[in-house]
């Protein structure tokens, strides 16, 4: 995809990946090919907003020929390809081939806090930084190569509790909040982070695009669960896709009663909804 700043795109599309654009079981996006091709034809920026690391996203972006900025590790940072915007990106630091705007604390601080909080409340936790690639693969179901990419973190630390009671887990969460940190759960794994949210990163990017294009842009976001609430709350049109069983996350519906409900889970629903957006529905 070419740089959108020189194209007459009317939309910005922000998308979660696993369970949204990507099939939750196979990680395939084949059911969304029609919409992806239409996005490219129109020159619409497609910005991935995900819990994945920069290393993981670089591979996926190459496969999808995506040259746009992306948001990693639950809003920890924005990575903007060098030369993408013809303006100064305030607060950005050079990281490899990108300008990086960081919202989260450095990874070393987060892992140190994980160990300190665990010791404080007497919780037995195991973080990614304490596991090698083989152990991460065994605990997550990822392949060895995928596990190595997931291990290359900048902001957010996945971890699990080893036999902790609900009371100890609650104490851990409260102790983390006392330190100004966030604890979220995604399946078996929990995530410790600080100072960031997906919506904050999305808002920052929307402002950059509008400064560059200087025309009306409609921001659209797609997600499927509570962890995407911040993302969905930050755009003009929020789209909630159903869970694999066809149900919608009631916690999102209660907070965003006017959210657009997608017609099907995963890439099938993603495809249909994006095409409807372009038709003005």
Predicted regions and their residues:
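Non-catalytic pre-domain segments flanking phosphatase-related domains
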Residues: 1-15, 63
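Mg2+-dependent phosphoryl-transfer enzymes with acidic/Ser/Thr/Gly-rich catalytic loops
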Residues: 3-9, 29, 189-281
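Conserved ATPase-coupling elements of RecA-like P-loop NTPase cores
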Residues: 24-28
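Active-site phosphate-binding/coordination module
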Residues: 29-127, 243
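Phosphate- and divalent-cation-binding pockets in alpha/beta enzyme and binding domains
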Residues: 31, 56-59, 135, 201, ...
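Residue-level detector of anion-binding/catalytic polar loops
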Residues: 45, 182, 237-238
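Conserved acidic, metal-coordinating active-site core of Asp-based
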Residues: 117-220, 226
